[in-house]
Amino acid sequence: MNESSDSLPLEELEKAPMPSIFSSLRATVSKPLQSVLDIEHYIKCNQRTEMLTQQYRKLMNVDTKLAGNIKRQSIAICPSIQFLPKGRTLEYFDKETYWLMLDYDHVISLVLDEKVEKASHSKYAMAVYRTISGKGLRI
């Protein structure tokens, strides 16, 4: 999570509707995150996420189809929308969160660490992390 002193206070962020989280990329049942800190937990501290990430990265160079199946088991967070609990299409749209996610894929490894570090210090970034492949960046 970004600790910039210029960011909105955590209390202010948590008054707004929270993004929906799905148990996997294929799941259609969701629930809203309980707090902004949940993002950090699910991405950086969750044992299931860590296990799936490690399996995915090991398999990417061996069996891309199996790696893709592993990836689809990962959690999915929809930053911009809070869905009604039983759907994942626009007909189940409930509330806007006013959040935005930037997703950069295939970042050259020579600059990825630098980009992660730089984005982590932005007052506008709530979370900065590498994608499941380890070759991308999400802000």
Language-model-detected regions and their locations in the chain:
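DNA replication initiation on ssDNA origins
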Residues: 1-98
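Generic alpha-helix signal with a bias toward terminal, lower-confidence helices
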Residues: 55, 112-114, 137
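Short, flexible loop/turn elements at secondary-structure junctions
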Residues: 81-83, 103-108, 132
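Generic detector of bulky aromatic hydrophobic side chains
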Residues: 94-95, 101, 111, 125
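Histidine-centered divalent-metal-coordination microenvironment in nucleic-acid enzymes
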Residues: 102, 120, 124-139
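Short amphipathic alpha-helix segments
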Residues: 107-123
